[in-house]
From Swiss-Prot:
GO terms for molecular function: RNA binding. Required for rescue of stalled ribosomes mediated by trans-translation. Binds to transfer-messenger RNA (tmRNA), required for stable association of tmRNA with ribosomes. tmRNA and SmpB together mimic tRNA shape, replacing the anticodon stem-loop with SmpB. tmRNA is encoded by the ssrA gene; the 2 termini fold to resemble tRNA(Ala) and it encodes a 'tag peptide', a short internal open reading frame. During trans-translation Ala-aminoacylated tmRNA acts like a tRNA, entering the A-site of stalled ribosomes, displacing the stalled mRNA. It is found in: Cytoplasm. Residues 13-27 have a biased composition (Basic residues). The keyword Cytoplasm applies. This is SsrA-binding protein. Belongs to the SmpB family. The keyword Cytoplasm applies. Transmembrane segments: none annotated. Gene3D superfamilies: 2.40.280.10. It comes from Corynebacterium kroppenstedtii (strain DSM 44385 / JCM 11950 / CIP 105744 / CCUG 35717).
Length: 183
């Protein structure tokens, strides 16, 4: 189920100071994750990551604050020196009307020029692709965790699964051994 994302404005009004509780100070810098791409780490070897802003319209932000988004099948491309996020699904805002956005429209990612140049060089090198790992709010602004990934072959996936099961079995055996000695 979708969770409702809420954020509190901690800014001070003009000339007046606003009292902050201890709870709001603790949560001021935390990430509020809206969506994650769980298949990305399974299907790709992650080589590098970046944090990018995203250009949105009002109803998209409202829909995201309700916790609704899907990163399935989404990817990023570089066209004319700009990074674009494609196939990100943000459903229409439930209380919107004729001003609602198109759910699967192409959205511009906001990065520094030197980051874009670096990404372009790495994508051109070989079988690399840009994939979003997560969408989250950071200090009230929506951010995208963008990753440079290389697609895994079937044998790579099998090796990863085998390695994880071996690690899991080793920790279980160690836990049983410790319990057997102490108990």
């Amino acid at each position: 189920m979708a969770k409702k994302a809420t954020l509190v404005d901690h800014g001070a009004a003009k000339g007046k100071k606003k009292a902050q509780s201890k709870v709001s100070k603790k949560n001021a810098n935390k990430r509020l994750v809206v969506a994650t791409n769980r298949r990305a780490r399974h299907d790709y070897t992650i080589l590098d990551t970046w944090e990018a802003g995203i250009q949105l319209v009002g109803t998209e932000v409202k829909s995201l604050r309700e916790g609704k988004a899907s990163l399935i099948d989404s990817f990023a491309t570089i066209d004319d020196g700009e990074v674009w996020l494609r196939h990100l699904h943000i459903p229409e805002y439930s209380k919107g009307h004729w001003t609602n956005h198109s759910p699967r429209r192409t959205r511009k990612l906001l990065l520094h020029r030197n980051e874009i140049d670096s990404i372009m060089g790495k994508v051109r090198d070989g079988n690399n692709t840009l994939i979003p790992l997560s969408l989250y709010f950071s200090d009230g602004k929506l951010k995208v965790e963008l990753a440079l990934g290389r697609g895994k072959q079937d044998y790579d996936r099998r090796q990863d699964i085998k390695r994880r099961t071996e690690e899991r079995e080793a920790t279980r055996a160690l836990g049983r051994r410790v319990k057997g000695l102490t108990g």
